[in-house]
């Protein structure tokens, strides 16, 4: 039997590691919107794909959190990725959107200290993708 074509490979491994990450804003302030949301999305792709060699399958936001569905190589450490992601996005976004964020945060905050992450199986992939895509729709409906 051949290798499943959905597997990714690198020099030393063949793998299929997919994760669903949710990061929440500090105090759940509703800051993820408009140009801020666009820049956050752009930074998310860049950090995950360029800095950590991950593949982003889906991103969606609500005003106080972001969902990221991504595949990662086995050598990637989840805690390092999340820490780096939160640190880099907070630093850049607080600098670029200082005036916009001023009414929400007096101290240099953006993200809550905690986060949610889970593995995604082949069976749950479609379900989680659909859930992430529908995040914005639930607040409108």
Label the predicted regions:
Residues 1-141:
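Basic nucleic-acid-binding interfaces
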């Amino acid at each position: 039997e051949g290798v499943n074509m959905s597997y990714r490979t690198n020099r030393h491994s063949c793998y299929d590691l997919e994760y669903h990450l949710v990061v929440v804003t500090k105090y759940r302030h509703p800051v993820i919107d408009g140009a801020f949301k666009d820049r956050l999305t752009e930074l998310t792709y860049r950090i995950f794909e360029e800095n950590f060699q991950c593949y982003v399958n889906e991103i969606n936001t609500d005003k106080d959190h972001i969902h990221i569905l991504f595949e990662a190589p086995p050598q990637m450490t989840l805690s390092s990725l999340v820490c780096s992601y939160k640190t880099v996005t907070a630093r850049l976004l607080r600098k670029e959107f200082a005036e916009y964020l001023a009414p929400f945060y007096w101290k240099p905050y953006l993200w809550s200290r905690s986060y949610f992450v889970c593995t995604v199986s082949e069976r749950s992939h479609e379900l989680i993708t659909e859930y992430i895509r529908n995040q914005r729709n639930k607040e409108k409906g």
